Amino acid sequence: MLVKLTEVCGTGAVTTGRRYSLREVFVNPEHVVMVREEHQMKNLNEQGMLTEGLDKKHRFSKITIDKGTTGTEIIVIGDPNTVGTVLNKRNYVLKG
């Protein structure tokens, strides 16, 4: 089962000015090995440096996804508790 989250994507180089956009991403919860608070994105959002119209109260999480011998990290909207709840939500089909 895949879970839909909203990822914060950075484009551009640090020297020329970093720009950010949002996109939907589908994650397999069975491959997530860690979720932690991402304070830098929260600070950038409070300064108005992220996507226009994004609520300044949003919190962000960095998710580490297992890729076998390595991992990949993405930043998503939501505090670690909320993201963890979404990732652990299971839909079961009862057979009678």
Label the model's feature ranges.
Residues 1-96:
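Eukaryotic intrinsically disordered, low-complexity regulatory linkers and tails enriched in Ser/Thr/Pro
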